[in-house]
Amino acid sequence: MITTNDALAALCETARTQRALALDTEFVRTRTYYPQLGLIQLYDGENVALIDPLTITEWAPFQALLQDQNITKFLHAGSEDLEVFQNAFGMMPDPFIDTQVLASFVGHPLSCGFATLVEHHTGVALDKSESRTDWLARPLTERQCDYAAADVWYLLPIAHKLMEQVREAGWLTAAINECRLMTQRRGEVLDPDEAWREITNAWQLRPRQLACLKLLAGWRLRKARERDMAVNFVVREENLWKVARHMPGSLGELDGLGLSGSEIRFHGKTLLALVAQAQALLEDALPEPLANLVDMPGYRKVFKEIKALVQETSEAHKISAELMASRRQINQLLNWHWKLKPQNQLPELISGWRGELLGEALKTLLQNY
């Protein structure tokens, strides 16, 4: 267990002589907005280290290691770990490769868990009984430490095997690009002024109600970040929507809508002030009504046609259809095509490696809609 600044510096100096590392994190995120880092696991091919973030104060050597361009950092299903690194250190591992992504290019399902991968490659069944442990509690038990260490001990040799398999299959460039896309997604920070678009059933609201929802959702997200509270512990999403829908004028009306006592006690006056602000807006300051994607004419038909095209293409190229196009990515494409959401960048299905395989066929298909 690495618990001092000097020990961490020595570990990082040794690790920087290697070309690849396996990394993992353990964290807790129950009531907080940001993940609370409890442990970092590192394996450089020679030494497994468990790094205790609760006792270390000087992170510069580790940050330099994270950013060392000569060392590939392997993680498995690392999307949340990327967020943990970004929040704790202001950066993500780079270059970074996700073994779950690698595995999906050589026949494994996209959702392939680490224990499944370990059993497939080594025949070892990992003990997952500590997965729900409190990683902020100290001291950690020997069993907890063994569980945490196993995640990186097995990861690095499996990563090397998968890299070779993906290279032989001709997908290495695509896999690396997919990992870059993961990093890019995790680096995108939601603008509080756009948070209203993420609220379930926002499309059911009229323009003035939407203006109210925009104010409410922006306030809630800022408050959650400021207080480090999960957004639903500020005000539950369904209650936020009800406030926008009914635009109450008193604490009694908030109570009648079903808001909790703590929501009214801590935030009731603020909610009412935001409702009043929305009521005072001029008509030309109100947002346009939101279209509901699934109610668009032809949605079900075009979705089915895209799924069929993806299935056909994935079979031809021997990679999983799940990897090639998720429901989220198909909906992103259709939102872009019908201009239902802000047009910030090209959809994932017609850019990068997916665009090379699907782009022209999708553009032709969408001409009918």
From Swiss-Prot:
It catalyses: Exonucleolytic cleavage that removes extra residues from the 3'-terminus of tRNA to produce 5'-mononucleotides. The keyword Cytoplasm applies. Its EC number is 3.1.13.5. It is found in: Cytoplasm. GO terms for molecular function: 3'-5' exonuclease activity; nucleic acid binding; nucleotide binding; ribonuclease D activity. NCBIfam families: PRK10829.1, rnd. This is Ribonuclease D.
